[in-house]
Amino acid sequence: MQTSPLLESLMEALRCLPGVGPKSAQRMAFQLLQRDRSGGMRLAQSLTRAMSEIGHCADCRTFTEQEHCTICSNPRRQQNGQICVVESPADIHAIEQTGQFGGRYFVLMGHLSPMDGIGPGDIGLDLLEKRLETETISEVILATNPTVEGDATANYIGQMCGQYGVLASRIAHGVPVGGELEMVDGTTLSHSLAGRNPIKY
């Protein structure tokens, strides 16, 4: 079937989004063109502006249109002394929603992966080391993903923190709230048993 070259181009562009295949891209394109052209224009304008204006925070490397993000610019956050290391800006959003962390962040934009040629310099560990050297940091909380690469990255950063006398801690991994033990994988259950907490009366 022959269609408009512009329509084909739109559908192909939409496929760059994660989880969007040919059918999903086609539905999105037809939805915008048939029922929500004003929404499509807003989307195009927001995308164009975001792609051209959003960069990285000079301190934590998260996404921001300023030199320093709002978290790093917050004096109360600066006085906290804690830095939480995460793999992506999306992880910051997830942690912020809990309301349990009042420090600052450092975004790796990935993890160590020698097989893929990703070393310490590729995920900004030189910048993190500079912060350890120049700032007063009381604790580095390692919130990398519970994967082989995430654990290796956390161990590497933990050793680096030790060189500067900075406490490094790893977020706990275990059985999810509301989960059933028989459905939990062995690795997660092992972490849960190793990280068990005493019951206080």
Curated annotation (Swiss-Prot):
Keywords: DNA damage, DNA recombination, DNA repair, Metal-binding, Zinc, Zinc-finger. It comes from the Bacteria. GO terms for molecular function: DNA binding; zinc ion binding. A zinc finger (C4-type) spans 57-72. The keyword Disulfide bond does not apply. Residues 81-176 form the Toprim domain. GO terms for biological process: DNA recombination; DNA repair. InterPro entries: DNA_Rcmb_RecR, Rcmb_RecR, Rcmb_RecR_Znf, TOPRIM_dom, TOPRIM_RecR. Pfam families: RecR_C, RecR_HhH, RecR_ZnF, Toprim_4. May play a role in DNA repair. It seems to be involved in an RecBC-independent recombinational process of DNA repair. It may act with RecF and RecO. Belongs to the RecR family. This is Recombination protein RecR.
